[in-house]
Curated annotation (Swiss-Prot):
Membrane topology field: Peripheral membrane protein
This protein's name: ATP synthase subunit delta
Gene3D superfamilies attached to this UniProt entry: N-terminal domain of the delta subunit of the F1F0-ATP synthase
Stated family: Belongs to the ATPase delta chain family.
Compartments (UniProt record): Cell inner membrane
Source species: Cupriavidus taiwanensis (strain DSM 17343 / BCRC 17206 / CCUG 44338 / CIP 107171 / LMG 19424 / R1) (Ralstonia taiwanensis (strain LMG 19424))
Assembly and interaction partners: F-type ATPases have 2 components, F(1) - the catalytic core - and F(0) - the membrane proton channel. F(1) has five subunits: alpha(3), beta(3), gamma(1), delta(1), epsilon(1). F(0) has three main subunits: a(1), b(2) and c(10-14). The alpha and beta chains form an alternating ring which encloses part of the gamma chain. F(1) is attached to F(0) by a central stalk formed by the gamma and epsilon chains, while a peripheral stalk is formed by the delta and b chains.
Stated role: F(1)F(0) ATP synthase produces ATP from ADP in the presence of a proton or sodium gradient. F-type ATPases consist of two structural domains, F(1) containing the extramembraneous catalytic core and F(0) containing the membrane proton channel, linked together by a central stalk and a peripheral stalk. During catalysis, ATP synthesis in the catalytic domain of F(1) is coupled via a rotary mechanism of the central stalk subunits to proton translocation.
Length: 181
């Protein structure tokens, strides 16, 4: 995995530079397109086609671009052709991840992974994200998951920081304290 991240980095940086300087759209539109490209490239069927040596590069690029729903600029089209020519289309999910990290760094924002024992209502989620934005001092983009094994409460991960206020975490802490005594 480190190898694909290393391969993806220069592509992500080059694409981010092109997206930042492009007059074809804003960085948000580019981010959506790159994210979609990463999802399409991660599809097992697309991986199989990309790994098939009998599929010509121009047909692979054409197929890949035809699956995308977002509008594709000439720069993005050339980028996909470059990936295909270099045999790197399967690295696109890693490129998308690093592109997103570069965008967050530019905007001074971060992704937050919120795991809750129960589904959160919109108001609860908005209040939680607002409180977390105050705590971390930056704009946060929430990705929410439900994990009933938490029993209650939430677990929050921003970068390498984890705030776990779940009942499961409290029970584990109590168990550790009781067995240590």
């Amino acid at each position: 995995m480190a190898e694909t991240a290393t391969i993806a980095r220069p592509y992500a940086e080059a694409l981010f530079r092109v997206a930042s300087e492009s007059s074809a759209g804003n960085l948000g539109a580019w981010s959506e397109l790159v994210s979609e490209m990463g999802q399409v490239a991660a599809n097992p069927d697309m991986k199989a086609v990309a790994d098939d040596p009998n599929v010509p590069g121009d047909k692979l690029a054409e197929l890949f671009l035809s699956v995308l729903k977002s509008p594709v600029s000439d720069e993005a089209r050339r980028f996909v052709q470059l990936l295909v020519e270099n045999g790197r289309l399967t690295v696109m999910p890693d490129i998308a991840e690093q592109f997103h990290a570069l965008k967050n760094a530019r905007e001074g924002s971060s992704d937050v992974e919120i795991t809750s024992a129960f589904p959160l209502e919109d108001g609860q989620l908005n209040d939680l994200v607002a409180a977390l934005e105050r705590k971390f001092g930056r704009k946060l983009y929430a990705q929410v998951a439900v994990d009933p094994s938490l029993i209650g409460g939430v677990s929050v991960k921003v970068g390498d920081e984890v705030l776990d206020t779940s009942v499961r975490a409290r029970l584990a802490a109590m168990q550790t304290a009781l067995t240590a005594a």
